[in-house]
């Protein structure tokens, strides 16, 4: 499609209102309803609620102040976010998986003055952290059915302290009442909303995300409206051949992450109808909704590939058979999965970026892709490699510095203003970027050899039997590894080989050893894995071993499984 009309930088709420006259009666969102039905939300209804909520927010926030949102995906999540931005504020998403302590840290550190929250479990975490949230003026409940007294009672039953209920009542307001406040202001002054949006500068922050660092507390990353708008325009330019105005999107990625928020904003720009789903329902919704747009993480693409057993007709049944614009993000995707979908006529686009870059730096694209790379730099992005191979970035989508952390900001930029990504990379002869490792994850063996563990671990990415490998061996004579298996494929292999129950453990170890031997044959002797341990505990976000963006927390793995890994040197 011709994306030219959408390339001019603008604040995100403008995407809804600039095209509202022609879209008002059309459907923006489809929400799951009981008995498998869907409930529609029109562009007009969506826009009206943004307008009302923005005028409520204007009464609670001064220009440039921050509002946090702590909720799973729902239309009100996006309504609140765009309302805050339209009012000149900064939206601060909080991951739904955050504990009460983590939630308190982000809200307190961000200086949030307004908090949007949904679901009883999340509101209970807010109440549990109440003593740390003194700077929050108002808590807005996204669902009117959420009962503060019941949440307080639930904490009492668990023996946790609860703030006085009178204080809760004073600071908490339900969604409908907040909308009513905004509607009253709108009736008093019909020009107030437009004045507020017109006053927002592209160069002021509109979004602040917290990095899910593999160690240490998260850092606040303020992004200006221009940062995000320029990155969005690059996405449009690169993917134009796959884009359609008014497409059907199946939206399930958390909007608290930049990937999911970006998908929702792209839908606002291009007039998509987005069916809202969640991790438990998305595989069932795919063949029902039959989307042309679908963005996901590697684990789900891999589930689809395994379920199809390589049969293209079966794959079409599982996905609805109309996929056109598809992205995979958060971690690397196995090559065999990319090749399977490509045979089915679907290019799974991968790229590379980080929160500090709004977020994308490189993308594979319809007219230029390599499955062994993360693509070429975006049109507005400059990349170069430092002497040690670290990827350095510069451009209008790169942020200006961390919130309240000048020391970290200084450490993140070179003296001549390039952002240090912390990743080691290389360019192919035809200009595609390949990621080799995280700079800080370099291991130095007892023999003085510098080893990039990811360069070894990534060689297992396409292995059907192995989910993850984490290499260990800093200051040691040789390398060992923790191995997480793919239960379904290993089980199928054992059944196919008719392995007796008593021999299963030995057969599994032999299988893993063969896979490791195959990779070792491609490595220098000092890079080879000499011993391994199979870990049964799940490597997931919920287990605390992956960040919300699916990066391995090496320090946490060392804490939990270090004894088992160290024992391999004594075996």
Please place each PLM-identified region on the residue numbering.
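Conserved pre-ATP/AMP-binding loop-to-beta segment of ANL
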Residues: 25-27, 166-210, 217, 242-248
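Conserved AMP-binding/adenylate-forming core of the ANL superfamily
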Residues: 29-82, 99-104, 176, 225
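Conserved AMP-binding A3 loop
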Residues: 40-44, 198, 206-232
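Structural core segment of the AMP-binding/adenylate-forming
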Residues: 58-59, 89-180
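Gly/Ser/Thr-rich phosphate-binding loop
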Residues: 170-175, 249, 292-296, 304-369, ...
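Conserved C-terminal "lid"/linker of ANL adenylate-forming enzymes
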Residues: 172, 468-470, 515-571
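Conserved AMP-binding/adenylation subdomain of ANL enzymes
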Residues: 229-248, 253-314, 322, 347
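Conserved ATP-binding/catalytic segment of the ANL
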Residues: 377-380, 384-386, 390-445, 462
């Amino acid at each position: 499609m011709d994306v030219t009309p959408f390339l001019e930088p603008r604040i995100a709420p403008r995407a809804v209102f600039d095209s509202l006259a022609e879209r008002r009666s059309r459907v923006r969102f489809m929400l799951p309803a009981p008995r498998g039905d869907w409930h529609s939300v029109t562009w007009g209804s969506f826009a009206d609620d943004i307008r009302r909520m923005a005028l409520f927010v204007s009464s609670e926030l001064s220009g440039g102040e921050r509002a946090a949102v702590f909720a799973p995906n729902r239309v009100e999540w996006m309504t609140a976010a765009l309302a805050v931005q339209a009012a000149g504020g900064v939206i601060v998403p909080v991951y739904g998986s955050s504990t009460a302590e983590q939630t308190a840290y982000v809200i307190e550190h961000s200086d949030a003055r307004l908090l949007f929250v949904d679901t009883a479990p999340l509101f209970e975490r807010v109440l549990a952290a109440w003593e740390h949230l003194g700077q929050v003026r108002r808590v807005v409940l996204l669902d009117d059915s959420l009962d503060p007294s019941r949440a307080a009672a639930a904490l009492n039953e668990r023996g946790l302290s609860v703030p006085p209920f009178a204080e809760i009542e004073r600071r908490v307001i339900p969604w409908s009442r907040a909308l009513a406040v905004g509607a009253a202001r709108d009736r008093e002054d019909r020009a107030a909303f437009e004045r507020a949006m017109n006053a927002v500068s592209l160069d002021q922050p509109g979004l602040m995300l917290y990095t899910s660092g593999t160690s240490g507390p998260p850092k606040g990353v303020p992004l200006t409206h221009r940062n995000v708008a320029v990155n969005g325009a690059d996405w449009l330019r690169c993917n134009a051949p796959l884009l359609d105005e008014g497409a059907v999107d199946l939206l399930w990625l958390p909007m608290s992450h930049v990937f999911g928020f970006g998908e929702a904003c792209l839908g606002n720009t291009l007039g998509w109808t987005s069916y809202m789903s969640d991790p438990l329902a998305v595989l069932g919704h795919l063949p029902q909704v039959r989307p042309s747009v679908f963005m996901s993480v590697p684990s789900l693409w891999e589930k689809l590939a395994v379920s199809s057993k390589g049969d293209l007709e079966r794959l079409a049944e599982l996905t609805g058979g109309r996929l056109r614009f598809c992205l995979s993000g958060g971690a690397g995707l196995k090559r065999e999965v990319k090749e399977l979908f490509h045979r089915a006529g679907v290019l799974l686009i991968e790229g590379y970026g980080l929160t500090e870059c709004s977020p994308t730096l490189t993308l594979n694209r319809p007219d230029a892709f390599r499955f062994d790379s993360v693509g070429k730099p975006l049109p507005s992005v400059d990349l170069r490699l430092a002497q040690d191979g670290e990827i350095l970035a510069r451009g209008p989508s790169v942020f200006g510095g961390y919130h309240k952390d000048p020391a970290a900001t200084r450490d993140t930029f070179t003296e001549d203003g390039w952002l240090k990504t912390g990743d080691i990379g290389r360019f192919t002869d035809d200009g595609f970027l390949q990621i080799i490792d995280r700079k800080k994850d370099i291991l130095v063996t007892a023999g003085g050899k510098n080893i990039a563990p990811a360069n070894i671990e990534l060689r297992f990415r396409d292995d059907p039997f192995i989910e993850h490998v984490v290499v260990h061996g800093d200051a040691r004579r040789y390398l060992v590894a923790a191995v997480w298996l793919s239960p379904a494929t290993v089980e199928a292999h054992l059944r196919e080989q008719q392995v007796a129950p008593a021999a299963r453990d030995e057969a599994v170890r032999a299988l893993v050893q063969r896979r490791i031997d195959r990779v070792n044959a491609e490595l220098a002797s000092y890079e080879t894995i000499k011993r391994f341990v199979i870990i049964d505990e799940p490597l997931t976000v919920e287990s605390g071993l992956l960040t919300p963006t699916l990066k391995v927390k090496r320090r946490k793995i060392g804490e939990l499984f270090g004894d088992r890994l160290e024992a391999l040197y004594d075996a």
